[in-house]
Amino acid sequence: GASGSSRDVIFVSTTDATPGYHSHPLDAGTWQIMLGAYVVSPDGVDVKINLRFTPKTRRWFKGDLHTHTLASDGRLPLDHLARHAREHGLDFIAVTDHNQPVKRASFPKIPGLTIIPGLEWTHYKGHSNFLGIEHPYEGSFFTNTEEETQQKFREAHKNGALISINHPLESDFGFHFDLEKLPYNMIEVWNGPMRPRNIEAIGWWDQMLKAGKRQVAVCGSDYHEDTVFQRLANPTLNVLAWSPSEKDLLEAIESGHSYFTYSPTDLHVDLYVEDATYGVIKHWREGLQATLNAFALEACDQIRLIDQDGSRILFDAPQKGDWQSNLKVMKPGYIRLEIWRTFFPGLPSMPALVTNPIWFD
């Protein structure tokens, strides 16, 4: 980039830069700094350049992995969707129109927002997001047999797509292909507003965990338009990543460094076992302890611990506030958390927050 003489401080990073400059990875090597001086004395001019490098640090980012635009059956063009996401406080979205690939070159430049290319592979027998790639497969999306479906998934996986199985237990749009024969990375266990089918999907996923499968879960709003029941980032994927770059976000999502909330809320739970948190596999030993910090609880919120032996209530919040506790990790397996909340008087409580597990071997 370049700028006029009135600017004496600039910054460049992988995801952002001073206006007039382009974001760019700070690759190792020799970089050139060009300085213009309008008037130079015969003795020359002394120039002092200060360089400050800020290393990456992991932090939380909020986003939505499942959105639609006018390119399929959504109601907003992509630029409106992107602005809508930023207005909701989101740091990233994935664009997943039905069987419609999208090019990064078409993405609007919205400060503070990372847009991830993807598509929702849509078939009468199941839906699946292919994320992080513009062209996951060649030819038509459609398949007529299980074998053709397997080939489509294998091709997308080989090309680098991150694959999620969407709303697997929905009555009208469930997933009816054989998962054992498909390559995939994640399962979308929370799709749109919390409802019985999502609770069933979370339970189904937990049975996988209890059977020893280290399966990462995700969530997505399946956003098409704002209605009484549907909102962008309802639910929200909260991701612990090194930066908001597409690469860092997708690596963290694939690894399970995430939890899900009903909206871009302040509700937050940190769960650490020494240096390990969600999605990490840690060696178990006697005396291992987990540290839990919950923030922005509402009165009557219930924190539940789920492990290979079942579920137990850790805390019933008597009022708004935060809560901290230390827990013993009793044996190998996994631990994860859920926070249940009663959103309306007279209705049953439902999950307001769900985490991925920490695993122990």
Residue ranges and their predicted role:
Residues 55-182, 188-205, 211, 220-227, ...:
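A metal-dependent hydrolase metal-coordination microenvironment
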Residues 33-41, 340-344:
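Short beta-strand-plus-loop segments that form exposed binding edges in beta-rich domains
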Residues 1-18, 311-313:
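Surface-exposed beta-strand/loop patches in noncatalytic accessory domains
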Residues 13, 17-21, 27-36:
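Ligand-binding face of N-terminal immunoglobulin V-set domains in extracellular IgSF glycoproteins
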Residues 53-54, 223-361:
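C-terminal functional module detector
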Residues 40-52:
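Edge beta-strands of jelly-roll/beta-sandwich modules across compartments, strongly enriched
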